[in-house]
Amino acid sequence: MNVLRKRILTAVVLLPPLLGAVLYGKGWPFALLVGTVAVLCAGEYFRMFFSTARDRWSGVAVTGLVYLFGILLPFRAAGAAVLCGVALAAFHFLAGEESPVERARGAALAALGAVYIGGFLSTYPRTIDLPAGDRWILLGLVSVFAGDTFAYFVGKRFGKRPLSPKISPGKTVEGAVGGLAASIALGTGYGALFLPGVLPGFVSLASAVVGMAGQAGDLFESLLKRAAGVKDSGTLLPGHGGMFDRVDAVIAAGPVLYLLALLAPLAGGRG
């Protein structure tokens, strides 16, 4: 079975439970699902950069705490708690027998992983609690996955100019443009059907911004993997690699999507 078929089969298997969780799993079921994804991603992230079980499990634990702070505490308090948690993590990773440079590198990587994975993913349970939050999350997923899919096919068919050859040689400018166009088109179409009270222009803008955030997240994860010297973050999902490989764009889009869902009423959107 080739890679494309594996990717399609994996997507078909995962799509129904994902849709069910978004549409019918508000509250703790949805938060638990996203938290599970955060833990899996954190496990892959810390396995890429740290060799000892102590550092890996400590990183996963801090990421989990950051995620819990993000979903349980009021917004400002959550920010302060996240900073405290990251500071404690940094102190933990600074301790050890390695050289000061290595320990400082470890502390920085731990703080980055905890905030990027745990903090960014914590915005999804917050988003689903907003008015029409489940539909906004689906808009984000449509924009991200449409952009990812079309960027792949457009890039393979028409791609000539490398987008970032030192980070991800396979990505092209043409693929990125095609992916962004797909994010806008499919996101706008989705909004017309499921967010009829929101201004179409705002939905198109939201789809574009989320699509760009998703592409940035994809490139950022490619940068992390290149820095770690690995091709995939893991082997959990056939055809995709690891969980972090599959949701890299979703992670980056989380805070942007949350902000857009908050701003929708101010832009005349009722959801």
Which stretches of residues belong to each language-model region?
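Juxtamembrane boundary at the C-terminal end of a transmembrane helix
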Residues: 259-271
